[in-house]
Amino acid sequence: MTKKLHIKTWGCQMNEYDSSKMADLLDSTHGYQLTDNPEEADVLLLNTCSIREKAQEKVFHQLGRWHMLKEARPELIIGVGGCVASQEGAHIRERANYVDIIFGPQTLHRLPEMINHVNGTRSPVVDISFPEIEKFDRLPEPRAEGPTAFVSIMEGCNKYCSFCVVPYTRGEEVSRPCDDILFEIAQLADQGVREVNLLGQNVNAYRGASYDGGICTFAELLRLVAAIDGIDRIRYITSHPIEFTDDIIDVYRDTPELVSFVHLPVQSGSDRILTMMKRAHTALEYKSIIRRLRKARPDIQISSDFIIGFPGETQQDFEQTMQLIADVNFDMSFSFIYSARPGTPAADMVDNVSEEEKKQRLHILQERITQQAMQYSRRMKGKVQRILVEGTSRKNVMELSGRTENNRVVNFEGAPSMIGKFVDVEIVDVYPNSLRGVLLRTEDQMTLRSHESTASVIARTRKENELGVGMYQP
């Protein structure tokens, strides 16, 4: 009888990536098949996020529901992973002693051994250590699930912003070796992936070892990924302003595979608040980066993160944030009301901004960003956009849906054979959350570079070093 696995995921794209790797890993080692129904699962995994307010209580609320399943089936295995597990591992066991496995973001690769231990001894396992980059060496080969894919290039963060728990839950920055990343992306390209999203808490801090003993920078990695046959679009999240260096900006000048859209969190437009947040840059320095980016790629569009109501934020501080939003003309944003994260320096600050004031400021900010986004969308009407067709439309199963470079959803009429390929459409209608297009040309009518498999490229360019070791040298 097939064993079933249910994974519930909260939080960032990195958590989504980790959950997909858990599923692939347990399928390869134990034959577990994913199910959306927790009642039929043999293993329940909760991949948690500690960014939002009351994250811990949300975890215990979910575990309470699963506890009833455990009482009915004592052999059911319940595991809690992610950032809340990393931060609150011991506390989770104290409050929910029926949880069998507690693991952190850096130890998910040990899940097979943990499950074997629980099955063999019926005793719990807690492993929330930070074993560097070991987990990537233990994960199964990547499996494409459509024309886009996410690839983790690094873990952790060294910035220690005063409001953020990431350094405490995911550890400090550790970069994957360059060749490992390129090989994973090449494998995905061979499976039909056309767009790759590079993931990390601070991707532009990437410093990965290369095969020759050197260090590969993020700018160099972007160019190497762009050279992989079959990869026609590159995105990345998330980056930090203080490491958005000129060599990264230069990639936007000469690498068309890198999309004209960048997410660059700023959090506030007030230098006083930025200092309290320990962001290590000013609003003017942030605007300087954007100015250089737009000089390198005039059509680039910018999204950002904003924290509203940080302790001590005055009306003047908020107005400076609104001025920055107008000056940069952000296209999109992820904006949230500040909530203290236990263990962070900001949690000890006096939170003297009323909830009503926070909500009002958030509403004003989001309204402004929405207006600016609609202005960008309206400018696209009548223009030709190249989109990567991802599948059928959510609005109408008889239509197709894809995304533009600037991350807008476009619905249009087309044939199923277009899924996974690029098409050019004319934008004819603009809606708040999507665009409507009319098909103009398909991929075989474009002048895209021809695709050659990775195996073929390696065979054609293979060389041996002085030790007789085969190497791929582009």
Swiss-Prot record:
Record's catalysed reaction(s) = N(6)-dimethylallyladenosine(37) in tRNA + (sulfur carrier)-SH + AH2 + 2 S-adenosyl-L-methionine = 2-methylsulfanyl-N(6)-dimethylallyladenosine(37) in tRNA + (sulfur carrier)-H + 5'-deoxyadenosine + L-methionine + A + S-adenosyl-L-homocysteine + 2 H(+)
User: Mind telling me which Gene3D superfamilies this protein's record contains?
Assistant: Methylthiotransferase, N-terminal domain, tm_1862 like domain
Name one matching Pfam family: TRAM
Q: Which residues form the Radical SAM core domain?
A: 143-375
- Pull one GO CC term from this UniProt entry: cytosol
- Residue positions annotated to bind [4Fe-4S] cluster 2 are 157, 161, 164
Instruction: Please give the cofactor(s) recorded in the UniProt entry for this protein.
Output: [4Fe-4S] cluster
Q: What is its main location?
A: cytoplasm
Protein name per its UniProtKB record: tRNA-2-methylthio-N(6)-dimethylallyladenosine synthase
The organism of origin for this protein = Sodalis glossinidius (strain morsitans)
